Swiss-Prot record:
InterPro entries: Fmt, Formyl_trans_C, Formyl_transf_N, Formyl_transf_N_sf, Formyl_transferase-like_C_sf, Met-tRNA-FMT_C, Met-tRNA-FMT_N. This is Methionyl-tRNA formyltransferase. (6S)-5,6,7,8-tetrahydrofolate binds at S111, L112, L113, P114. It comes from Helicobacter pylori (strain HPAG1). The gene is fmt. Its EC number is 2.1.2.9. It catalyses: L-methionyl-tRNA(fMet) + (6R)-10-formyltetrahydrofolate = N-formyl-L-methionyl-tRNA(fMet) + (6S)-5,6,7,8-tetrahydrofolate + H(+).
Amino acid sequence: MRIVFMGTPGFAEVILRALVENKNNHIEVVGLFTQMDKPFGRKKELKAPETKTYILENHLNIPIFQPQSLKEPEVQILKDLKPDFIVVVAYGKILPKEVLTIAPCINAHASLLPKYRGASPIHEMILNDDRIYGISTMLMDLELDSGDILESASFLREDYLDLDALSLKLAHMGADLLFSTLKNFSSITRKPQDHMQATFCKKITKADGLVGFKDAKSLFLKSLAFKSWPEIFLENSLKLLEVGLVENEKSHKEGEILEIDEKGVLVGCLKGSVRVAWLQAVGKKPLKAKDYLNGRRLKIGGILA
């Protein structure tokens, strides 16, 4: 079984790795299509996608393609690879009709479709405090995440997971699901999506990390969803790191400092309170919350803003 893999970030790399390192000799990854290297950090040095890095670091004999668009000559390149399936995981591009007709294009999407179509389904699961997390495989069509569902897998949340932990868990689940979908493709009954039930999620931006001390539960969930990027920060750009939800009922002044100890600072919200372990000012290293407050001469009863 010849597979062309299309994917870019770490989530896709976990699934690509599983396909490449599988012990089933019937699966062969014959090509990687991924996004172009992009400037990263203050020095704007080019950074390769995680999927590309995995192939290069492991000296794998898998050709890598990073086209700006999926037109000619890329369509012919795809045809020449003679894939039995094209597997798409967080690629970042919509596939044109010319690609969709080369081979069945199977997308692993990190939600229980038709819920959370779009770029940030895992963020949305966390932000909406979902109790059930899941992933779907679907047969791609010309619209965004609207194709027939092939299979899905899910689990009941037992504890809160941040973006990194949930992404990793769903990626491993997605790899297992893809193996099943590829193996049983010819016998799977496709399930058309109920488009009336579809919900959509947008691309995350830096501005999404801006928070205030209004609702403790919402602030806590944002800290989980935006842990890797953009993190969460106040209007003065002070980052709140390692945030825990203490309670979500009592009413306090926004940003009121309720307690200070070695575990961090307990901060009141209009609804509830959170404990913040570390604080980081712009251009500075993270500090224990207690040390940061001492440096700013902020005490119990003061306002963190």
